Regions:
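Charged, low-complexity interaction regions
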Residues: 29-39
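Alpha-helical transition-metal enzyme core signature, strongest for iron centers
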Residues: 20, 47-52
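Short, charged, amphipathic alpha-helical segments
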Residues: 10-14, 37-49
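N-terminal acidic leader/helix
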Residues: 1-30, 56-63
């Protein structure tokens, strides 16, 4: 994979990471100061694990 392809892939990973961040923020804002319910907590855990996977992919892509 050349550097241009890596850059495109990295950009795609960043966009996906940002989208997941937005989804997490939306869930937290739904609670609006109230404790998150179990479904919300599980959903956030799932989204956070997806974010971690994207970070692993980005690091692997950059050879870290």
């Amino acid at each position: 994979m050349n550097n241009e392809e890596k850059a495109r892939m990295y950009h795609t990973l960043l966009l996906r990471h940002d989208k997941l961040d937005g989804q997490i923020s939306d869930i937290k804002s739904e609670a609006a100061g109230v404790e998150l319910n179990n479904d919300q907590k599980k959903q956030i855990e799932l989204l956070e694990s997806q974010k971690q996977e994207l970070v692993r992919q980005a690091m692997s892509l950059m050879g870290v």
